[in-house]
């Protein structure tokens, strides 16, 4: 299998696909705050900083399908970064096939959004995260 690179159109809800970001944060608390969705006085959702940074809206994004990992010591090892992820066995081989067992840089943070295919054309320069791609974790019959 290969990394899906959505280069056209917008971000899309895509059952069976996981989009992955790698990065570095000071602490798990800072990471949690970065992905946390707030509510205004009327109860309307306010996009998280993560959503704003990567131009993700609520139409195709379900925050219940987001997983984060923070490890204390940065690593280049994809196995260590993805350890404990849902569907680990399905996704690790695809990312290793694409990147190799080690990334070129060290990271301590992983953000995974399931059933969501990020449009790489929306990728922006970000001091905390890089978009690593999307892979299929579960086949769906139409």
Where are these regions (language model features)?
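Low-complexity intrinsically disordered segments
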Residues: 43-142
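Short, extreme N-terminal segment that most often corresponds to the first beta-strand
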Residues: 2-40
């Amino acid at each position: 299998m290969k990394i899906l690179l959505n280069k056209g159109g917008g971000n899309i809800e895509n059952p069976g696909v996981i989009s992955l970001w790698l990065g570095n944060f000071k602490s798990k608390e800072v990471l949690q705050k970065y992905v946390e969705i707030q509510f205004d006085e009327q109860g309307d959702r306010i996009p998280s900083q993560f959503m704003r940074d990567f131009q993700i809206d609520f139409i195709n994004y379900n925050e219940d399908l987001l997983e984060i990992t923070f490890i204390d010591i940065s690593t280049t090892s994809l196995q260590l970064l993805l350890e404990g992820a849902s569907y680990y066995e399905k996704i690790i081989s695809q990312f290793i096939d694409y990147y190799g067992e080690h990334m070129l840089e060290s990271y301590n943070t992983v953000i995974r959004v399931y059933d969501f295919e990020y449009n790489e054309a929306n990728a922006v320069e970000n001091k905390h995260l890089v978009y690593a791609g999307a892979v299929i974790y579960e086949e769906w019959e139409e």
